[in-house]
């Protein structure tokens, strides 16, 4: 058994060292005692070592021993090549694939050697994976590698995790067959053993995949070769079984990559002489380029350096270092190689990395210029000197989709979607039928492929940053788009080919567009600076805006008013959905303003109105001579609506002014006067209504912002929308404004009496038109004819000083305005007084603290107008505290009278302060009295409360026995005594009640 293993090793070492090449004319029938055509090599492996002369530290005394097996080895290799070539011819003829260069016998011999070598390396891979004990023994025998060999990450120590995985399928008999010591093998050395150990034991391609499932045999793809191979005996007879030795024979490409990588790059760079002959192995150019993908030192433009590196000779210590580094970098790529007669479309294009195409593009262009038909060949060279002559398939950009699925055939990168020159191409049906032969797949491979792809990409990302920084991001983007497509491969084959061929020089990842995305720009860079897109996108957005699909009415104008071509296209498409045929301009404008909320700046609104004018002129071409005339009149209508119904103060625009302002604006002529008058009275009688969102219309009234009532703008309008505010009283009242704010006299033109239907709701008096009864919670917007009046912190009392009209009461507001109201009867007057004061006492918030400063001028404080949320008890306590404070302030003021000879300003300040404090004291006294009466009837009717209040008032007005002032002061006349509250007075206060007053102070106090 030991001899069987030593003879192939010795044979290869002799061949590699002496540069001997076999003669292709001999055809022995057996190798190592196994029948060639029927039984694959499963037990005997042939590891191929690099020549001893290729290492500077190799011994030089082994040539005599190795030459003893030279003749036998050459005969065996030639025999296997002959048998494999015969089987290849039979398979090609049975599959019916096109035959290229059929008369070339050297080509047949070459392919036979390739296939037979694959079988040998597969056997070697299986035996090495199953023999964990052998590896442990070998590691013990191998000394540590030198530092020059470990200077790069390519020569890394073995990983124990992979060793454990690879040792799961080991068997006892096979371990015994291969437990020969490495030192006893002729032609080998410790240095080569370390390198072999790193290649075969640490290389993940020779171990089981970490994502594969080894529990079920034959269902999951494995990096190792299975224990049993029932189909390998007849693999040359079936097109399906032909894939097994090729798909799983990844070890062949790894071994050859280690042996021949330096010469491959040299061959591409222009050197056609191989460093040493290996007759039965041929490296594919894509693998050579793929292996150098991650290495920035061997790009296509630096192939000359690699050639010079090979020319240094095999004695250079750099050769094994570079080869091993490239092998480690190429561990993430696999290729499925078949004879050219089986598939004219080569399968490895779908698995080649994106950067492979970038590296090989200059080579492809040169090869295509020499012979376009070479793009169909599948590497038909018979020796290394012919590698530049044979043209491999043009690598296409690709990303790995789940293998074995139809999705992978739909990619723009798939080889079956690419044109292959003038050679025959398979039909769409045959392309789909042959997909199992094109792609390496198994029932559980899709998950493993995605996992390994991510792992490989992460390992190569650090090596690609200097050359291809954008490749990983584009590859990920392509993967996201590629996995979402599931269209028919036959329908997209020609289209994808064109997209891939045209996009090659510009984008590293051209994508096939779906029919839904055909109108969209292929990349964001194709958009202009002002976001121009095509008409299809503008029309789709306009349709969504018109149908309010995902938009509200208040959001439509934002997409129509921008100053760019796309926004104008959207606005034009949006207006195309409106039909204005036979409508007047004001009617069309009203309908348009009901569809959207016209918002934005003046120039933004003008852009939207211009699109409206274009559409109106298109629908009514005979109404106006041009679009500009329609646009001018539309803007004039908008300004007229603002002037007549806006919040402006002053005289409104008349019809004559409206006509005069538009003179000469209809393309140099005047608009018809009848048209302008009709538009004026239409807007004056009915203002333009603005659209509101449906959400705002459905929510409660208190949440809605209240629109303005005519020219009035008052914060009390918001209180009119609150349905929680109770209605205290309503009826007909005549009103007269006696003083405006701050107690100033009302101008002459505004002193007249006016009749209103007055409504007291909450703490606001509303003056409405009509005499109907208003219910609680009913909206008052649109029915008010004058500004509402707030009664917070106000006091209503009978107007005893006014004698011109009966039943008149006065209302002093918080801003010191004074209103006179006339009620129909005295009872109505008393009811209005009581209920206004009750509303003020219930809803008036406590005043803010007084300001602190050095200014001695008296200024009335500003009282809060927001309604309070406190209960009646809390309000009662608050008003009592305010009453005590006002009483104390008034007492302090009376104790500190100004000097008799003081200036007039000081006396005026004293008068204003005293008047204010007396009013505040009276107001809080009234509030406390009303709240006490209200607390007795918290839930009762206000009519019962009024009756009880009236009884208390009548009882308080009855005369009570008391001393008259004339008794204490006989000199004072009883009729001239002032009616003031009895308080404790000092001497200075008695001066105001004496009849004899100094002349200088009579008119000032």
Curated annotation (Swiss-Prot):
GO terms for molecular function: guanyl-nucleotide exchange factor activity; lipid binding. Residues 870-926 form a coiled coil. GO terms for biological process: regulation of ARF protein signal transduction. Residues 726-841 form the PH domain. Residues 493-686 form the SEC7 domain. The modification Phosphoserine is found at residues 85, 88, 97, 381, 435, 968, 971. Residues 161-177 have a biased composition (Acidic residues). InterPro entries: PH-like_dom_sf (IPR011993), PH_9 (IPR041681), PH_domain (IPR001849), Sec7_C_sf (IPR023394), Sec7_dom (IPR000904), Sec7_dom_sf (IPR035999). The keyword Membrane applies. One of its GO terms (cellular component) is ruffle membrane. Residues 453-465, 476-488 have a biased composition (Basic and acidic residues). Residues 27-66, 145-189, 287-386, 407-525, 694-714, 951-1005 are annotated as: Disordered. Residues 992-1005 have a biased composition (Basic residues). Residues 350-361, 428-438 have a biased composition (Low complexity). It is found in: Cell membrane; Cell projection, Ruffle membrane. Keywords: Cell membrane, Cell projection, Coiled coil, Guanine-nucleotide releasing factor, Lipid-binding, Membrane, Phosphoprotein. It comes from the Eukaryota. Guanine nucleotide exchange factor for ARF6 and ARL14/ARF7. Through ARL14 activation, controls the movement of MHC class II-containing vesicles along the actin cytoskeleton in dendritic cells. Involved in membrane recycling. Interacts with several phosphatidylinositol phosphate species, including phosphatidylinositol 3,4-bisphosphate, phosphatidylinositol 3,5-bisphosphate and phosphatidylinositol 4,5-bisphosphate. This is PH and SEC7 domain-containing protein 4. The gene is Psd4.
């Amino acid at each position: 058994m030991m001899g069987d293993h030593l003879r192939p090793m010795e044979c290869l070492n002799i061949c590699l060292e002496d540069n001997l090449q076999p003669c292709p004319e001999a055809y022995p029938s057996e190798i190592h005692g196994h029948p060639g055509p029927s039984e694959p090599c499963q037990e005997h492996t042939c590891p191929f070592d690099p020549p001893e002369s290729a290492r500077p530290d190799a011994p030089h005394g082994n040539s005599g021993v190795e030459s003893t097996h030279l003749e036998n080895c050459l005969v065996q290799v030639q025999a296997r090549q002959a048998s494999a070539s015969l089987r290849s011819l039979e398979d090609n003829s049975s599959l019916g694939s096109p035959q290229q260069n059929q008369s070339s016998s050297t080509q047949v011999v070459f392919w036979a050697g390739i296939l037979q070598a694959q079988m040998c390396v597969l056997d070697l891979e299986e035996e090495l994976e199953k023999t964990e004990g052998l590896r442990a023994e070998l590691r013990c025998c191998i000394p540590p590698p030198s530092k020059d060999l470990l200077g790069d990450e390519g020569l890394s120590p073995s990983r124990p995790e992979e060793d454990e995985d690879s040792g799961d399928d080991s068997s006892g008999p096979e371990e015994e067959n291969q437990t020969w010591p490495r030192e006893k093998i002729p032609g080998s050395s410790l240095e080569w053993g370390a390198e072999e150990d790193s290649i075969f034991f640490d290389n993940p391609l020779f171990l089981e995949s970490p994502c594969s499932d080894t529990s079920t045999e034959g269902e999951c793809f494995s990096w190792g070769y299975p224990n049993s191979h029932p189909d390998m005996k007849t693999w040359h007879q079936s097109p399906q079984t032909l894939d097994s030795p090729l798909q799983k024979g990844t070890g062949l490409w790894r071994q050859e990559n280690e042996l021949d990588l330096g010469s491959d790059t040299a061959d591409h760079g222009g050197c056609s002489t191989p460093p040493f002959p290996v007759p039965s192995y041929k490296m594919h150019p894509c693998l050579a380029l793929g292996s150098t993908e991650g290495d920035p030192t061997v790009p296509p433009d630096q192939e000359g350096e690699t050639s010079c590196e090979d020319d240094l000779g095999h004695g250079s210590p750099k050769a094994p270092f570079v080869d091993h580094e490239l092998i480690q970098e190429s561990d993430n790529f696999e290729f499925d190689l078949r004879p050219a007669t089986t598939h004219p479309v080569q399968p490895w294009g779908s698995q080649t990395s994106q950067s492979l195409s970038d590296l090989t593009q200059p080579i492809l262009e040169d090869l295509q210029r020499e012979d376009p038909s070479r793009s169909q060949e599948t590497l038909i060279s018979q020796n290394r000197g012919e590698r530049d002559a044979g043209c491999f398939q043009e690598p296409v950009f690709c990303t790995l989709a789940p293998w074995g699925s139809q999705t992978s055939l739909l990619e723009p990168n798939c080889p079956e979607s690419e044109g292959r020159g003038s050679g025959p191409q398979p039909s769409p049906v045959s392309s789909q039928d042959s997909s199992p032969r094109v792609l390496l797949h198994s029932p559980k491979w899709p998950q493993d492929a995605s996992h390994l792809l991510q792992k490989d990409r992460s390992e190569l990302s650090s090596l690609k940053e200097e050359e291809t920084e954008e490749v990983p991001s584009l590859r990920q983007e392509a993967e996201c788009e590629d996995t979402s497509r599931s269209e028919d491969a036959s329908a997209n084959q020609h289209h994808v080919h064109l997209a891939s061929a045209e996009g090659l020089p510009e984008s590293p990842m051209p994508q096939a567009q779906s029919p839904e995305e055909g109108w969209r720009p292929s990349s964001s860079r194709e958009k202009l600076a002002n976001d121009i897109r095509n008409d299809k996108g503008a029309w789709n957005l306009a349709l969504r805006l018109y149908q309010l699909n995902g938009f509200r009415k208040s959001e439509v104008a934002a997409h129509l008013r921008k100053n760019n071509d796309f926004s104008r296209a959207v606005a034009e498409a949006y207006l195309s959905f409106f039909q204005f045929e036979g409508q007047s301009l004001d009617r069309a404008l009203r309908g348009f303003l009901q569809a959207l909320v016209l918002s934005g700046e003046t120039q933004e609104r003008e852009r939207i109105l211009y699109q409206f004018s274009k559409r109106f002129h298109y629908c009514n071409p005979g109404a106006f001579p041009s679009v500009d005339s329609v646009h001018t009149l539309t803007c004039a209508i908008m300004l007229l609506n603002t002037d007549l119904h806006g919040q402006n103060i002053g005289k409104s625009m008349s019809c004559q002014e409206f006509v005069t302002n538009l003179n000469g604006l209809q393309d140099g002529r005047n608009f018809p006067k009848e048209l302008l008058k009709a538009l004026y009275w239409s807007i004056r009688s009915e203002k333009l209504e603005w659209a509101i969102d449906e959400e705002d219309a459905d929510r409660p009234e208190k949440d809605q912002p209240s629109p303005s009532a005519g020219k009035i703008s008052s914060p009390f309008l918001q209180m009119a929308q609150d349905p929680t505010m109770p209605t205290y009283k309503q009826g007909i009242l005549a009103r007269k404004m006696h003083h405006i704010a701050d107690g100033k006299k009302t101008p002459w033109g505004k002193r007249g009496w006016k009749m209103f239907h007055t409504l007291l709701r909450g703490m606001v008096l509303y003056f409405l038109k009509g005499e109907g009864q208003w219910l609680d919670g009913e909206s008052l917007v649109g029915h008010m004819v004058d500004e509402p009046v707030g009664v917070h912190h106000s006091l209503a009392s009978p107007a005893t000083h006014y004698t011109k009209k009966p039943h008149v009461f006065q209302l002093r507001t918080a801003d010191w305005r004074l209103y006179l109201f006339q009620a129909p009867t005295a009872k109505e007057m008393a009811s209005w007084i009581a209920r206004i004061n009750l509303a003020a006492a219930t809803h008036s918030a406590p005043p803010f603290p007084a300001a602190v400063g050095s200014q001695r001028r008296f200024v009335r404080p500003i009282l809060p107008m927001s309604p309070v949320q406190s209960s009646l008890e809390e309000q009662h306590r608050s008003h009592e505290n305010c009453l005590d404070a006002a009483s104390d302030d008034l007492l302090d003021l009376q104790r500190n009278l100004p000097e008799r000879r003081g200036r007039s300003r000081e006396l005026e300040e004293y008068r204003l302060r005293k008047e204010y404090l007396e009013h505040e004291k009276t107001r809080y006294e009234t509030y406390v009295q009303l709240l006490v009466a209200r607390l007795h009837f918290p839930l009762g009717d206000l009519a019962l409360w009024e009756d009880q209040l009236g009884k208390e008032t009548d009882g308080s007005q009855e005369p009570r026995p008391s001393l008259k002032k004339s008794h204490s002061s006989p000199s004072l006349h009883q009729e001239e005594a002032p009616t003031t509250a009895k308080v404790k007075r000092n001497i200075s206060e008695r001066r105001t009640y004496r009849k004899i007053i100094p002349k200088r102070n009579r008119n000032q106090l």
